[in-house]
Every structure is written in C-alpha cells, then in structure tokens.
C-alpha cells in the first residue's frame, strides 16, 4: 500500500513539473536556441505557373537549435487567397533540413497564391509558420 501512495505522489509531482519542462513561450524558445524563419527562393513574386507544370519550391531557412531533430518535420502549405487561409498541404512530411520540394501545380487558378513553409518538433518545438506573403505568385487558368 505504501508503494501505491509513493507512486501516486511521484506522478502528481511529475505532472506538476511537466509544463515547466515544455515551456514554448517566445522568450524560452529564444533562450534555448532561437526561433524558426524561412525565406522563399522559388517560385518568385509574380511568377505565372500553369496547372500540371512541375515546379521546384525552394527556400532558405533558419532552424532553431533543437535537441531531438529526428522528431522535427517540415511542411509546405498553399493559400489561394493571398495568405488569409492555408487549406492545402502540398508536401508530405519532410525532414527538417529539407530546403526544396518538386511540386505539380494544381488546377486551382488564382492571382494570389502564397506558400507557408512550416516547421515543428513533437514535444520539443511548437509548429511554427512562415507565410511568404511577399512572394505572391499566379496559378493560371488551364
């Protein structure tokens, strides 16, 4: 019976300390090794893409210093409304050091396509967004 009480006490203490161990505030992230950012290289601002076209999406990023990089991932999302909403994930889950993805342009005409290059690590770094609104491009009608 004493073992059961000791185990219960240990679990209560562990759960009480858990939020402190997973502090993901901007200040804590900066102190632990920086924040995430990305800059789109291609497609470029104003570039006209056509449905079915193969395009290399390429970016340069600054990754935070994360303890367990194997638990991290990247994704690229597409907005068709100038970056107000990102409803289409256009990549599979990518390794964190990936800097490009070969993409087949969908038949989704818009004059305001924007990409968001995302990064995150389960339990170690929150999903972080880097929408590329300064690099709006066009998906032409088929």
List where the protein language model places each region.
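Bacterial N-terminal signal peptides that target proteins for export
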Residues: 2-11
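Bacterial N-terminal signal peptides
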Residues: 11-20
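Signal peptide processing junction and immediate N-terminal pro/mature segment
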Residues: 21-31
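Extended, solvent-exposed regions of the mature portions of secreted/cell-surface glycoproteins
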Residues: 29-142
């Amino acid at each position: 019976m004493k073992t059961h009480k000791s185990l219960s006490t240990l679990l209560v203490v562990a759960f009480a300390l858990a939020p402190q161990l997973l502090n993901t505030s901007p200040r804590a992230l900066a102190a632990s090794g920086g924040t995430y950012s990305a800059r789109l290289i291609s497609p470029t601002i104003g570039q006209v893409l056509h449905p079915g076209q193969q395009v290399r999406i390429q970016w340069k990023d600054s990754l935070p210093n994360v303890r367990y990089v194997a638990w991290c991932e990247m994704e690229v999302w597409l907005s068709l409304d100038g970056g107000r909403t990102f409803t289409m994930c256009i990549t599979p889950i990518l390794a964190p050091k990936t800097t490009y993805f070969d993409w087949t342009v969908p038949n989704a005409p818009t004059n305001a396509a924007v990409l968001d290059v995302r990064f995150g690590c389960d339990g170690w770094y929150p999903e972080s967004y880097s929408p590329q609104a300064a690099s709006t491009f066009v998906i032409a009608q088929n």
